[in-house]
Amino acid sequence: MALNIENIIAEIKEATILELNDLVKAIEEEFGVTAAAPVAAAAASGEAAAAKDSFDVELTAAGDKKVGVIKVVREITGEGLKEAKAIVDNAPSVIKEGASEAEANEIKEKLEAAGASVTLK
């Protein structure tokens, strides 16, 4: 029996979603495997974080350049000097909740450039 990969691929392209679902189930049963295993492994390896749509930016430590970090915290939060200093002094503290991935990374870069340690949650 000759196996023609191109014919198999052509058949798969023409199949409906239901037919493909049945094919996957049949392959799983025949070979004792599961199609969900790679997805679970990817999620366990931290790729689930990439699927998040909102992040909390947490200041974990101010570092040596505390004054610069306070200025950046004021810029990000819109708080006054006293409030921004309290946030920095009481680290770890959340600077921004529910930020988009792009916004969270931008805030993280600004804080790290000022000398702070930051984590995204």
Swiss-Prot record:
One of its GO terms (cellular component) is cytosolic large ribosomal subunit. InterPro entries: Ribosomal_bL12, Ribosomal_bL12_C, Ribosomal_bL12_C/ClpS-like, Ribosomal_bL12_oligo, Ribosomal_bL12_oligo_N_sf. Coiled coil: none annotated. This is Large ribosomal subunit protein bL12. The gene is rplL. Forms part of the ribosomal stalk which helps the ribosome interact with GTP-bound translation factors. Is thus essential for accurate translation. Belongs to the bacterial ribosomal protein bL12 family. Homodimer. Part of the ribosomal stalk of the 50S ribosomal subunit. Forms a multimeric L10(L12)X complex, where L10 forms an elongated spine to which 2 to 4 L12 dimers bind in a sequential fashion. Binds GTP-bound translation factors. One of its GO terms (biological process) is translation. Pfam families: Ribosomal_L12, Ribosomal_L12_N. One of its GO terms (molecular function) is structural constituent of ribosome. Keywords: Ribonucleoprotein, Ribosomal protein. Gene3D superfamilies: 3.30.1390.10, Single helix bin.
